[in-house]
Design a protein with these regions (language model features):
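Amphipathic, alpha-helical segments enriched in basic
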Residues: 1, 5, 18, 44, ...
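Short glycine-rich loop/turn motifs that provide flexible caps or phosphate-binding loops at active sites
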Residues: 2, 26, 49, 67, ...
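Core segments of cupin and vicinal oxygen chelate
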Residues: 2-5, 9-48, 81
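Vicinal oxygen chelate
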Residues: 5-13, 31, 55-123
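Conserved short beta-strand elements that form part of the metal-binding/catalytic scaffold
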Residues: 28-62, 108-115
């Protein structure tokens, strides 16, 4: 999985409108992620997997791509050593760890390490 594009997220102010747009344009279908308190729709049948996520009014967004890594802590450390920035890792319960990053040119991306043993918050 090292370096493979594994996930993308498209921010939207209106998830119904965005689902209609991408569904019609690209033939995508969507399913509710089931994550409590978040308007987050997973693409079905796309490679890599993706999602449409609602952003709050006044926020702007840009698509975020996720690259797979074998060791998220080593990868975030390397991002910093190479002159980029990296957040501390955060959990994706039952799936793995992610970290938001920026490269030396200010481009945002995320890293993801699969680990299905990551517990839900409070567990």
């Amino acid at each position: 999985m090292q370096g493979k594009l594994v996930h993308f997220e498209i921010p939207t102010k209106d998830s119904s409108r965005a689902k209609r747009f991408y569904g019609t344009l690209l033939g995508w279908s969507f399913k509710d992620s089931g994550m409590p308190g978040i308007d987050y729709w997973l693409t079905e049948g796309t490679e890599p997997a993706g999602a449409i996520m609602k952003v709050e009014d006044g926020q702007t967004g840009h698509p975020i791509i996720y690259f797979g890594v074998e060791d998220i802590e080593a990868a975030t450390r390397q991002v910093r050593e190479l002159g980029g920035t990296a957040d501390e890792k955060g959990p994706v319960p039952g799936q793995g760890w992610f970290a938001g990053c920026k490269d030396t040119e200010g481009n945002a991306f995320s890293l993801f390490q699969g680990d299905d043993s990551v517990p839900a918050p409070g567990q």
